[in-house]
Design a protein with these regions (language model features):
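Intracellular loop-helix junctions on the cytosolic face of multi-pass helical membrane proteins
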Residues: 2-26, 145, 173-349
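Central cavity-lining transmembrane alpha-helices of secondary-active solute carriers
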Residues: 69-84
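Interfacial helix-cap and linker-helix signal at transmembrane-aqueous boundaries
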Residues: 53-54, 85-87, 171-179
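Helix-loop boundary and gating motifs at the non-cytosolic
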Residues: 24-72, 309, 318-331
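Loop-to-transmembrane helix entry/capping segments in MFS-fold secondary transporters
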Residues: 61-62, 145-157
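Intracellular juxtamembrane helix-capping segments at the cytosolic ends
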Residues: 129-144
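C-terminal ends and interior cores of transmembrane alpha-helices
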Residues: 101-117
Length: 349
């Protein structure tokens, strides 16, 4: 009888262990909804931006697309710096919260025409803090040997991204066009606000994921320093946006060859800066480690080169993908019949 009881206990324990092996961390739900609402707010605002600039602020088509291009380009650029600042100073969780708050402010600033550049600056910097740290925070939820659960977790995480991106144009886009532009932007802001509230309420479910040692995610005792960083970042991004808009009439006077030469010169300057900073960091690292240890091995260089090759194709893909918020939106607005199952009374006569 005792053997049967022991076997039953072992069977129950094995069943529970199997369930636990496939059960995702509770923190994944928090990140899932935070990312879903962030993507809802981003794609909701993106679906309205170009149409709002042209139909409400009387921008020309070229100027509206230029501003949209600047905004989108900086949205993809700032996560590099946001991720670096989070790794070195803030920690992922605090950077995530800072980015979320900035985006809430940015979306509601879109309701005021005079605050357009400030709104875009807040959204860009907020995205820079938020976007890289959500993805990496998902990975921090799992321990060693949980590669299978981590892979499944990322699949669930990307379902949240797709769900938010799917709902945004249907809800925020419809409100913006049919009711009023500011209602659409406010809808995106409300979505981001829900994401922030849900993120704050779910902090305990994330455990120590994304935190530095002895760090409290909602401790902003160094608020003055943080405000200085964030304020300087927003001001710098706003200056870039305004600068591009200010110099765009002169850029239009350049020929295509001159524009290409200017772009190549800027790219060369960036590469020189990166190589110079890399050589400086390499020399500092070399002075601190034995000569027998190379900072980057041959196999690591091969992986870096592979990443750069893949990155070239990714850039081409996202360049085409982001036309959905610009040229494709204008094409759909001007050349697409969006009425279904409409009966024309004239056709009956």
């Amino acid at each position: 009888m005792s053997d049967i009881k022991t076997a039953t206990n072992l069977s129950n324990q094995l069943t529970n262990d199997m369930k636990n092996d496939h059960r995702q961390p509770s923190g994944l739900k928090v990140i899932f909804f935070a990312e879903m609402w962030e993507r809802f707010s981003y794609y909701g605002m993106r679906s309205l931006l170009v149409l709002y600039l042209i139909n409400s602020l009387s921008y020309t088509r070229d100027n509206a697309l230029a501003l949209y291009g600047i905004y989108t380009g900086l949205v993809y650029l700032t996560p590099i710096y946001g991720g670096a600042i989070a790794d070195k100073y803030l920690g992922k969780r605090r950077a995530l919260l800072i980015g979320a708050f900035l985006m809430v402010l940015g979306h509601f600033c879109m309701a005021f025409e005079s605050l357009l550049y400030l709104a875009l600056g807040l959204l860009i910097v907020g995205n820079g803090f938020f976007k890289p740290n959500t993805s990496s925070l998902v990975g921090d939820l799992y321990g060693p040997g949980e590669e299978g659960k981590r892979s499944a977790g990322y699949s669930i995480f990307y379902m949240g991204i797709n769900l938010g991106a799917f709902l945004a144009p249907l809800i925020a886009g419809t409100l913006g066009e049919k009711v009023g532009w500011h209602y659409g932007f406010a809808c995106a802001g409300v979505g981001m606000t829900i994401g922030v509230i849900q993120l704050l309420m779910g902090q305990d479910k994330l455990g120590r994921a994304g935190l530095k040692e002895h760090q409290n995610p909602v401790d902003f005792s160094d608020a003055q320093l943080l405000l200085t960083w964030v304020g300087a970042s927003v001001a710098f991004v706003c200056a870039i946006i305004y600068g591009f808009q200010f110099f765009s009439p002169w850029l239009e006077l350049l020929s295509k060859t001159q524009k290409v030469m200017l772009e190549l010169s800027l790219l060369a300057g960036i590469l020189v800066y990166l190589l110079n900073s890399k050589s400086n960091s390499h020399s500092e690292a070399s002075s601190q480690i034995p000569e027998s240890h190379s900072p980057i091995s041959q196999s690591e260089w091969a992986r870096v080169i592979a990443i750069f090759i893949v990155m070239l194709f990714v850039i081409v893909f996202w360049t085409g993908f982001e036309q959905a918020g610009g040229t494709m939106t204008l094409f759909a607005d001007k050349n697409t019949d969006r009425e279904l199952f409409v009966c024309d009374p004239k056709s009956k006569h």
